[in-house]
Amino acid sequence: MLKFDIQHFAHKKGGGSTSNGRDSESKRLGAKRADGQFVTGGSILYRQRGTKIYPGTNVGRGGDDTLFAKTDGVVRFERMGRDKKKVSVYPEVQEA
């Protein structure tokens, strides 16, 4: 009597896995208002992580470091020395 030793092997190898294939959603950081633009109080001026730009006159800083206007006025991006920047909001002067 004959005995056959039959073994079955995969004719297609396993696909394996990869550690890539995902990306985080963009946070939409950066300037939201331009220099010289008129803004109302509460308007977001700059979204950032950390203090890339510092708050100046009439500008507040939120819990996530977002800069916002405290009053109505014109936006001005200014330098603080050689390596720092700030954003200020100056109220428009009403001429009589």
Swiss-Prot record:
NCBIfam families found in the cross-reference section: L27
Entry keyword annotation includes Ribosomal protein: yes
The keyword Magnesium is annotated on this UniProt entry: no
Gene: rpmA
Modification after translation: The N-terminus is cleaved by ribosomal processing cysteine protease Prp.
Bias-annotated ranges (Basic and acidic residues): 22-33
Cellular component aspect of the GO annotation: cytosolic large ribosomal subunit
Alphabetical UniProt keywords: Ribonucleoprotein, Ribosomal protein
Region (Disordered): 1-33
Domain of life per record: Bacteria
Residue span(s) of the pro-peptide: 1-9
InterPro entries linked to this entry: Ribosomal_bL27 (IPR001684), Ribosomal_bL27_CS (IPR018261)
Gene Ontology MF terms: structural constituent of ribosome
Natural source organism: Listeria monocytogenes serovar 1/2a (strain ATCC BAA-679 / EGD-e)
Gene Ontology annotations of biological process type: translation
UniProt family annotation: Belongs to the bacterial ribosomal protein bL27 family.
Protein name: Large ribosomal subunit protein bL27
Sections of the chain in a coiled coil: none
